UniProtKB/Swiss-Prot annotation:
The keyword Aminoacyl-tRNA synthetase does not apply. Its EC number is 1.1.99.29. This is Pyranose dehydrogenase. It is found in: Secreted. It catalyses: pyranose + acceptor = pyranos-2-ulose + reduced acceptor; pyranose + acceptor = pyranos-3-ulose + reduced acceptor; pyranose + acceptor = pyranos-2,3-diulose + reduced acceptor; a pyranoside + acceptor = a pyranosid-3-ulose + reduced acceptor. Belongs to the GMC oxidoreductase family. GO terms for cellular component: extracellular region. The lineage of its organism: Eukaryota, Fungi, Dikarya, Basidiomycota, Agaricomycotina. Keywords: Carbohydrate metabolism, FAD, Flavoprotein, Glycoprotein, Oxidoreductase, Secreted, Signal.
Amino acid sequence: MFPRVVRLNSRLVSFALLGLQIANGAITYQHPDDLPSNVNYDFIVAGGGTAGLVVASRLSENSDWNILVIEAGPSNKDTPETRVPGLADSLPGSRTDWNYTTIPQDALGGRSLNYSRAKVLGGCSTHNGMVYTRGSEDDWNYWAEVTGDQALSWDSVLPIMKKAEKFSQDFSDQSVDGHIDPAVHGRDGLLSVVASYTNVSFNDLLLQTTKELSDEFPFKLDLNDGKPHELAWTQYTIDHNAERSSSATSYLETTGDNVHVLVNTHVTRIVSAGNGTNFRSVEFAVDSNSPKKVLQAKKELILSAGVIASPQVLMNSGIGGREELQAIGVDTLIDNPSVGKNLSDQAATLLMFDTTLPNTDYDVAAALTEWDKSRSGPMAHGARLNHLTWVRLPDDKLNGSDPSSGKDSPHIEFQFRQISHQLPPADVPNQVQLPDPDSIGVVLQFSVVNLYSISPGSVILNDNDPFANPMIDLNMFGDQKDIAILREGVRSARRMFSSPAFKDVINGTVYPPADVTSDEDLDAFLRTSAESYWHGVGTLSMSPQNASWGVVNPDFRVKGTSGLRVVDASVIPRAPAGHTQVPVYTFAEHASVLIAASYH
């Protein structure tokens, strides 16, 4: 992910948002000692992120069931800045972030990368860029094939996605004619989606490019129709009141009081009955200096701690590769070397072009005040620019091997960010020399993303301290094909901004410099500029029922156990052609049906 250009004064934010009213149907507890002693929970959800709150909400529809959610971070009610769409770029690295760092990456010259994961109720849906992309039809069919579960095919999940979605006219009543295909969307679900946009001249120039370079950059009416390999208007999880729509606001706040939420509390282990394979108990504590407590679910324990923390919890509980667990002094209860492996993410780089286009900068304090008073202005939008571009590379650029899920899937994404006088801050871990701000004018900045990295990473424990961060290895560019595809993405972007539409407003590329053109020079640039796009999945991958690999079965049960399921991004076998929040919502909706059906 990329530069945090918005720098905020926390006192300013708190003052501006004093009037923000937040409802919550569930009962929230701030400390383990506050939990009622007379409630026996049918289900315990370990992790109150995107998936965990979907599961809790759906299970709560049975009023006879009591559900407990345990979340390490604060409540979204205590972090009002997460409600404001325009503050999304300020959240990574903040109090709502785990602030992970990867181990040094060999192919990046030993650089370690920031790896943002949300630590707040609602998880990454409370913390992300709110982009709503479903992935490609090919992705879902691939997942169905690799897991042996046709319930994950595109035709099977599309009704689930529509049922969960509440697409609506946005807060400013902008016309969306020509921006979306209404037939693709649902309107009666819980998760709010809009196609809001800012009126900037850059919009018209991009659309003109889709006519001038239509072979490479055709226009797509709706990026969520299952075949996303064109330029399209972005859609966001924002509600009609210009507030972020997350699993905390859309799902949790609609539940009854049969859902209890314990925040600021870490899940340290899941506990088996008599060192067997029946896992229904969870151990938790506020911090490393606090006493640990254990609660047992009457029916099931659902682990939803995310792509990093879920494998960490399993390994600390004795579920993982025997040799790795023995090395850190953890007794092995279930020997499964797939735990923590298969980390699948997306590699990205930032591109900058010197331009005479009007800039998109604004006064943050004034914009916050406007949003607070009227839910309008730049803070009401998910981004300063309004389009995503998906590029499918021609076969002759793939060196005989196509890493995508199919012919209707793109290899590359362009996410346009801003046109600004501001450059990324100096504290971004980036070894490439940024241009001197005094030597250039306004700069168009956007990300170029390799959607399908084929070199898998891993999450491994340093020791058996559940409060210590694990070792995260993205293995970025571990395969030369990954850097080759991102290199072609950079060249594709340069072709876009060499089109006639941009001839009079683009003065040239400044990052990387214009003379960086050869394979060797572009690769050197990428090795010193690439970052993770923070779309990690796969560390507890789903696989067929009797497969010798993978961690969970298609019913989300952890292989070799009873009473324990995993529902979060970690079970998705591979990153999609797009952003990950919609697949996580969809997997969670599917899992909720399976869990509830087990008790009917």
